[in-house]
Curated annotation (Swiss-Prot):
One family name in Pfam for this protein: MukE
Location in the cell: Cytoplasm, Nucleoid
Acyltransferase listed as a keyword: no
Protein name per the record: Chromosome partition protein MukE
A Gene Ontology biological process term: cell division
Assembly and oligomerization: Interacts, and probably forms a ternary complex, with MukF and MukB. The complex formation is stimulated by calcium or magnesium.
Taxonomic superkingdom: Bacteria
Described purpose of this protein according to its UniProt entry: Involved in chromosome condensation, segregation and cell cycle progression. May participate in facilitating chromosome segregation by condensation DNA from both sides of a centrally located replisome during cell division. Probably acts via its interaction with MukB and MukF.
TM region(s), chain numbering: none
Family: Belongs to the MukE family.
Region annotated Disordered, chain positions: 195-231
Amino acid sequence: MPVKLATALSNNLFPALDSQLRAGRHIGIEELENHVFLMDFQEVLEEFYSRYNVELIRAPEGFFYLRPRSTTLIPRSVLSELDMMVGKILCYLYLSPERLAHEGIFSQQELYEELLSLADESKLLKLVNQRSTGSDLDRQKLQEKVRTSLNRLRRLGMIYFMGNDSSKFRITESVFRFGADVRSGDDAREAQLRMIRDGEAMPVEGSLSLKDDSDDNDRTDDTAPETGEDE
């Protein structure tokens, strides 16, 4: 075993970080210690994970995640259609001027209102109940499902809840996994809006996902670690 790989695997950070990556979590600069570790050992860890038929990816925005190949030896699951739509909306909000105005913080209600304004409400309700009649009960169920999707994306490192207030969150750059492909000269926010309204698929269908048990109640690692840098 190469000396540098042995050093990485024996590091106290590695066991928990490895578990998070295998579970689908995205590691951005918000998790400074883990991010620096991955930067330092990226090359040897790429070789290590290739043995499991997954790729350690460093995205252009700087965050890390594992991308499985079709022959992966690590269990995986796929995000639901609603999860992916919520992810697209989060990416749209990240690109919005409001993110800077609000210091990057949004509320669940703002997310829900943006979702209804940009996507077809009848199609959203069908995701919750195929026989939806557009009743208040159906809308209530949709809002609950959106909260569940948001919590699932939190577990993947896409957002952080603000302290003990789960109604507010900060979006991380990892939401660019849900971003539209932008050609040179195109406006990124407009491209994202087109993808949302056209219902285009986004390229995370092969991504790893955390187990979905207790999504609504799991509050582990809700808040961003303290770092010396703002997002």
